[in-house]
């Protein structure tokens, strides 16, 4: 292990998780942050982070206790330290400021692409698969082209049981069985309103020797 960094989720209310982290460059990453719901008001976004601007926890001289959660600040785990005030626990910005005051800079996410707005903007009817659980993000051409893969949960929404009798419930979208889908995205063709300032077009140079892609 050469590095360990903190990343702040962007919406406490959305109960988001990180399903994928893909490399854009040597120290820039694309983070897939999402909820698990389907609909036009859901949270599915890709954020660009730069580890060069964040604190490597392995470089700290703080006490470390695996039984207490790892790196300690004032005798508390990082989670415990951030949660010791209601303001920091409920607001990611306050939490980041609390950590910076302790000498730790989390990786800051800059919006790269709002997947929800892109999908529903392209088809407001909802007939296009909404990609409720984006769990795979393939990056090519320095981030100009993305392929998103959706987890279908094996086509199962859940199960129910009465006594020893179990029944599996089929996962559906728009009344049809969900089998999972992939979404190819050409970022150069995505309207500006769906992108954020985290999208920086890479520099592409093509010569007789081949193609070189430089990521800022």
For every predicted segment, state its role.
Residues 1-216:
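Sequence/structural signature of beta-propeller domains
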